[in-house]
Amino acid sequence: LAAWARENEIWLVAGSLPTRVTGESRLHTSSLVYGPDGSLQGHYHKLHLFDVDVADGHGHYRESASFVPGEQWCVIDTPFGGLGLSICYDVRFPELYRQLRAAGASVLLVPAAFTHVTGEAHWLPLLRARAIENQCYVVAANQCGQHGAGRRTWGHSVIIDPWGQVLAEAQENVGLIQAELNPQFLKQIRHDMPVLNHARLRSGWREPE
């Protein structure tokens, strides 16, 4: 991964990946961020584990049987803005994304393996909501296809702007999507509708001058 980032001179977000936990038989579900020089710029361990029942061929999902949750949110500073890291089921917990926004995120990253059932119903509405309420770009890459044990994932990887508009979307297949992120557009939206300044349930949040 480091070599790919270095050879192509890109920022690379690799997630999610299983990573070892010292003293634990279980693993973390993690995202790793590499800079264009190949250096590891930061990592995030998934906070919210998917222990749910879904009306699909798999039925019972118990992520905690194999994984332990992380303890800390993460924003990575880059030349094009802060990258707020999250993974899959995290997207159902808006308080995480508000924290990422308050910590300087302008792009929210959501690598995922949303099931076909939950994805068809909730994938796009949840992602658009996180983009709109936090006035951030959202880049969400979702697994697709039929897997073992009756599991099927939704695909439809997507890029969304801070106004909630879909800039690019894949279908239920493997593919490549891209979109241009406009810092001035993001700045204008935050200026015109300063939601952090209006938030009353948490104190001390102000839009940077």
What is each residue range found by the language model?
Residues 1-14, 82, 88-177:
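CN hydrolase (nitrilase-like) catalytic-core segments centered on the catalytic cysteine
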Residues 184-209:
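A short C-terminal boundary segment appended to hydrolase-like catalytic domains
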Residues 19-22, 146:
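Short glycine/acidic-enriched loop and turn motifs that connect beta-strands
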